[in-house]
Amino acid sequence: MSVYDVAIVGAGPGGLYTAICEAKRGLKCVIIEKRKDISKMTRYCSEHIILEEMYNGDTITVDVGAKLDKKGEIPEGTRNVIKSTHYGWEVEYVGPLCPVRDKYYYSAKLEHNAHYAWPDKHPFAWKYDKASFLQQLLNQVIELGIEYISETTCYEARDLGGSEGVLLKCVTKGKRFQMKAKKLVEASGASAQVAQTLGMNEGRIYFASALTRAYYMSGVKGYNPAEWCGYWGLCYGSNFAPLMGTGPAGHYDWADLILIGHPAQMPQGLFEHFTQKSPVAHMFENAKVEREHSCMTKAFAPMKVPYKGNVLVIGDAAAFVETQMQGALNCGQWAAEALEKELDGKPGFDEYTKTWQETFEFNDDGMMQVQSGYALIPYYSDEQVVYLFSLLDDVILPGSWSQYASPRMMWNAIHKHDERIQKERPDVWDKIMNQQGKTLSDSMSQ
């Protein structure tokens, strides 16, 4: 039976970067990955580098290796460097980039919107090629001599306690085998399947299951790859706002239409309504679906303490939905530091936990209240959302990608009109006063 210092389940950015950082510290590690080829995206992902200052505890910058081309993009083959201002890591990314400069949240019938942008229009995010980036990280893993086992599922993990380490039971192409490691890093993504076998998901609040389908479409009228748009109102067919943003690498001229449903509102039905019956149906008269991706995400409250015994859970596996690529890289660096200390008999996992809790916004106890900023539909009627968004006319909010900062900004701007709302629309004011208990699960269960 093979024995390692560290076993890592999952070859996403967090797992790969953990291995890279560990190998540079002289640790013997192995990565177990269920996919055959990580350079091919089989599950939908937004693929953005977020540039907001102190977004999830860090400010990311990108040293772009070329000027924008005639299409307003950074071309394929460009050497770029992604940098963490707060934690100090640098990672090279060779590939295309497309800037995101404006975000619009539209009310019913496109009458009003919440607009996020910087005055000089500098980007608050870059669309990148995640599949290519993962392959580049894997190339580093292989160059460092780290063992990488693909097409393999870890179906059970057992913490043997103390110095005995962890026993992993795996299967590849119908053949079962076992291995041992002194420490285990669970980096399998939002499904957190290994954590589940260890009972580490017990006690996490379950919010909802989101069925997400993305349609990459050519020929969408009015589409701008530098814009990210959300459409709020039942007239658009969904309780959860349809989103439209930048298409995939190599096809930034395609729109990325994202529809989030649940068993009572399946994505295909939402697609048909949005593209054929909604106020924006005219945009799709000559559009063509070029490619589709989907995923199912179970939204759980984050793990406040993401370790147990010899097992550390990192990245999306411990998060509320996702940490984004940059957050996963941070987790990878912290994990490597923690593992080195743990193997030296020091409390590295405690230090990781402290950093985890302080860094990611979703660990704030007020997260449920922030969620309510997005629970507009069906709590508010379409007409009431139109009224609320009308209060934002002639207002441009700071450029923001954050799913936590954006609703705060929007509601702060709306609350500047509290006296007006109370006078003009007592019905809306009553709902605002009672909104705190509304969450995403309310929107997605109706």
PLM region descriptions:
Residues 3-31:
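N-terminal Rossmann-like FAD-binding beta1-loop-alpha1 element of flavoenzymes
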Residues 31-36, 316:
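Conserved acidic E/D residue at the C-terminus of a beta-strand in Rossmann-like folds
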Residues 376-446:
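C-terminal auxiliary extensions adjacent to catalytic cores
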